[in-house]
Structures are given as C-alpha cells and as structure tokens.
Amino acid sequence: MPKKIFKEGKKYTFSDYFEMKNPTDEIVAELGYSFLTKNLVLPRSEDIDEALIENLRTAYYAIIPKISVNSEASKREFMIAPILQGVIRTIEAKLNIEYAIEVDERLSGLIDYFFHSKQDVIVIEAKKGDLERGFNQLAAEMIAVDKYEENDSPNMIYGAISIGEVWRFAILEREIKRLVKDIHTFRFPEDLQDIFSILKGILSS
C-alpha cells in the first residue's frame, strides 16, 4: 500500500504542493481525481488583433534588457500580466488577482489569476521556475475550484502554468474527475499569438 502524501491534522495551502516531490498522478489520486498527459485540442480564437500582439511583443523587447526577471513577482509583472491585460480588454470576462479559496484542510490559498466568463474559467499560476512542480500546484488549484464551484457549469475547468518564458495548459473534466495536462508547451514571446489565441478562445467559447 503506497504511503499517504498528506499528514493527518496538517493544513495544506496551494504553495505547499509546489514543494511536494511526488508525481502529479499520485497527488491528484489522493484528492480523488485521475490524471493523464496527452495532446490537447484547446479552443482558439481567430479574432486576434495583430497590432495588439505586436505592441505586446515590442514592449517586451524594449523593456526586458533593462530589468531583472529572476523573481516570481517580476515574471508576473512584466511577462504574464501584460498578456492577461490584453486578453481582458478584448472579451467579456472578469479577472481576479490573488483570488482566495478555502475548501478544506488540503485545499486553500491564493490563486494568482482567476478568469471567469459566462461559460468558462481559467486558473493561472505563475512560478519563477520548475514547470513540473509548478504544475502540481496548478493541479491543486484547479481541483479546489472544482470543489468550490457549487454548480456543474461549466463542465470543464481550464488551467495554465507559466514560468514567464514558457506556458503549459491543462483541463479538468469535472464529470469524470480527470485532470489532463497538455503535452505541448508554448514559449513567450515566440508563441505569444498562440497563447493569446488560446486564452481568448477559452473565455469566448
């Protein structure tokens, strides 16, 4: 019988999941979910403002030589937030920053960015490094949102983990309680149009 990951009587926050060295499938299994990695076909918007994308890219290239982005806060401020601000300007959705959720002793804390539209939600976690361990934290946050949302709509929760230079997406299929990690990653700023298209596609679907 595998050793339990969670200790009795201890309260876990989302950031604790980043410190866990267990594989994602073992962590989510203890929370009652299954896990899969595969090629995800994510919604994409074709209605992309090319000028907006170019402005974001130009601003990044102009400012990045002048600042240090070796902290989580700096990556959020200069590499992630500008993309999200661009998305929110073009759609009908609400963006919460450092959104507090408390479900139970295992699932509580702050979600970096929480997008909510009429149809879909996106949980976005920003880390300064280590995409894999960051994904464990994202998984916990997506499961927390699933449990926190009282109704069954939307039937899918989207998530993204970003270390600034790299993004990876995931979905949580609520009905069958399965978390799916996309096998692909997207680079910033090289794949900025793809990242923007996916975020907008999810929220406007």
Sequence positions of predicted segments:
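Conserved catalytic cores of phosphodiester-cleaving nucleases, focusing on short active-site segments
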Residues: 79, 112-128, 140-141
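Active-site metal-binding core of divalent-cation-utilizing nuclease and nuclease-like domains
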Residues: 93-116
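An alpha-helical interface "stripe"
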Residues: 69-101
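Mixed-charge intrinsically disordered linker/loop segments at interdomain junctions
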Residues: 2-10, 168-202
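Short amphipathic alpha-helical segments and their helix-coil junctions
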Residues: 53-66, 117-126, 200-204
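Nucleic-acid nuclease catalytic cores
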Residues: 128-135, 143-180
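Charged, often low-complexity linker/regulatory segments
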Residues: 1-78
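Buried hydrophobic packing segments
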Residues: 80-84, 138-145
